[in-house]
């Protein structure tokens, strides 16, 4: 099987490329990435060692893939992932996330390649999320009509574009609305990948802040281990002939949900370090107080559930970071 992974030097893309090469016999994995994010150059070297080819390519600026062979499957991970970019990098977000998808779909249509798309839980309407009672998890039929951020808009628009191309060109697709994912090889920042950042700061005894919602650290998210996501996508590939043209939520679920206070507690236990944590009351216009994924549909389709709990996620991050501190410090 010939597979193209866009954003293959990103956190999800690189983990996925290595995992699929190890778990699909005779798979030929190709990665494309614009190498614009911190850490992507390091992941590029790792992929090379695993004999996975990566081509430096900005998919939003490419209208043809003449130098590439036909692929059986394209796994579309490439995106500008930071939600805060919706405020000050609108052109970049739009081009990377929507025009990039359009260019990929033209390749799919030409070659009759199937597509697995990594969308986002950010497609859901923020106004409705603010009214949500705690304890309720988000299903696929939750409101997507109201404002959500430019980032969320481009992800939702990409979903709709994929469906149109599927109908017009008979392309099989899977759309995963992925929530918060973490694990080794995530170079976290405050606005994206904060679980990884939390563990890194504890390991190195560096200050953190509880940001937004009065700075109390009580906002809730569910977290999915990167290996659980990779295992799901492997299942989706194996079952694509029978299960296709489906859209589903994918996340850690209620059992893997936590607030920042709990994340601090777990990070302290694993690192055995207590650090100073400040408080910033001002809330980002794109932050929500509560989001937990309902996995019932993806579980029904694939009999899949996350296997790795929060402690496992934190522990795996810590024991990846600790022996590699000197290499990793310039990426955090």
What do these predicted ranges mean?
Residues 87-89, 185-190, 287-289:
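Short, solvent-exposed loop/turn segments at secondary-structure boundaries
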């Amino acid at each position: 099987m010939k597979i193209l992974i866009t954003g293959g030097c990103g956190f999800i893309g690189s983990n996925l490329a290595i995992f699929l090469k190890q778990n699909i016999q005779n798979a030929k994995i190709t990665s494309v990435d614009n190498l614009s994010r911190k850490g992507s150059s390091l992941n590029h070297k790792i992929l090379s060692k695993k004999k996975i080819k990566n081509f430096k390519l900005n998919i939003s600026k490419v209208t043809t893939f003449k130098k590439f062979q036909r692929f059986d499957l394209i796994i579309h991970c490439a995106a500008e992932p930071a939600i805060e970019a919706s405020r000050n990098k609108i052109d970049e977000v739009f081009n990377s996330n929507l025009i990039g998808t359009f260019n990929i779909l033209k390749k799919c249509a030409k070659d009759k390649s199937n597509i697995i798309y990594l969308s986002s839980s950010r497609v859901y309407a923020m106004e409705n999320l603010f009214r949500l009672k705690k304890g309720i998890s988000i299903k696929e039929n939750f409101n997507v009509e109201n404002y959500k951020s430019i980032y969320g808009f481009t992800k939702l628009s990409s979903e709709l574009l994929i469906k149109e191309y599927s109908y017009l060109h008979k392309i099989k697709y899977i759309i995963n609305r992925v929530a918060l994912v973490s694990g080794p090889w995530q170079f976290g920042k405050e606005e994206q990948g904060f679980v990884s950042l939390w563990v890194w700061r504890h390991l190195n005894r560096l200050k953190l802040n509880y940001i937004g919602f009065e700075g109390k650290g009580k906002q809730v998210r569910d977290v999915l281990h990167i290996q659980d996501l990779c295992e799901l996508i492997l299942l989706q590939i194996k079952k694509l002939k029978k299960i296709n043209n489906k859209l589903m939520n994918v996340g850690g679920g209620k059992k893997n949900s936590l607030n920042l206070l709990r994340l601090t507690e777990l990070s302290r236990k694993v690192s055995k370090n207590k650090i100073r944590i400040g408080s910033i009351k001002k809330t980002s216009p794109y932050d929500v107080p509560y989001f937990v994924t309902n996995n019932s549909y993806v579980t029904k389709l694939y009999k899949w559930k996350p296997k790795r709990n929060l402690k496992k996620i934190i522990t795996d991050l810590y024991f990846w970071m600790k022996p590699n501190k000197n290499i990793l410090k310039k990426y955090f």
